[in-house]
Amino acid sequence: MAKVFLIMLGGPGAGKGTQCANIEKHLNSSAHISTGDLLRAEIKNKTEIGLKVEDIIRNGQLVSDEIICNMVNNFIAKNEKEVIVFDGYPRAVSQLEALLKEATAETKICVINLEIPDEILIQRIVSRGKTSGRADDNTEAAAKRLAVYHAQHDEMIKAIKAKNLPYFVVDHLGGPDEVFNEIKGVFANVGLH
């Protein structure tokens, strides 16, 4: 069975998780993967990877592409759903390359980029911080996260376009339902229903 890799990109606070959950509900044969959720599950379950990742994060370091890519590859190998929705992954060109190696000749790949101005992303992150309890949901940390995001994102978009992958931009200024209607329009373009 041919798989579909649906890659959802967008800055922190863009609503990727919300839209990925909507997609998973809408497409019966889909699975939603968030690398953050995978990492938290590994840490919670105190697996070998989880203990390693917990130590890396505690020391303020970034989890390596190797660890992230291995976790994603394991998820893909074990998953039998037709559509895999990637929430904010890949984040870097090296991760994109690793993901493309997992694709077969029959795999359809579609990239959706949720575009929203930085000022609104920062407002959303700070607003979310009031209820999330996340220490990095404040104005200063949000600005730093956005700077890192833009540095990686711009290179990713260049690589996606260079590989001629189907790429769609969705203006994410509307409400969640309005945005999801735009995403459903993308589905029609790539043969998903």
UniProtKB/Swiss-Prot annotation:
Gene Ontology MF term list: adenylate kinase activity; ATP binding; metal ion binding
Region (NMP): 34-63
Protein residues bound to ATP: 13-18, 128, 174
Residues annotated to bind AMP: 35, 40, 61-63, 88-91, 95, 134
Any one GO CC term of the record: mitochondrion
Purpose of the protein: Catalyzes the reversible transfer of the terminal phosphate group between ATP and AMP. Plays an important role in cellular energy homeostasis and in adenine nucleotide metabolism.
Quaternary structure, from the entry: Monomer.
Cofactors, names only: Mg(2+)
Residue segments, region LID: 127-137
Any Gene Ontology biological process: ADP biosynthetic process
EC number(s) per entry: 2.7.4.3
Catalytic activity: AMP + ATP = 2 ADP
Record has GTP-binding as a keyword: no
Compartment list: Cytoplasm
Influence of pH: Optimum pH is 7.5.
Keywords: ATP-binding, Cytoplasm, Kinase, Magnesium, Metal-binding, Nucleotide-binding, Transferase
Identification of the protein by name: Adenylate kinase
Family: Belongs to the adenylate kinase family.
Domain of life: Eukaryota
InterPro entries in UniProt: Adenylat/UMP-CMP_kin, Adenylat_kinase_CS, P-loop_NTPase
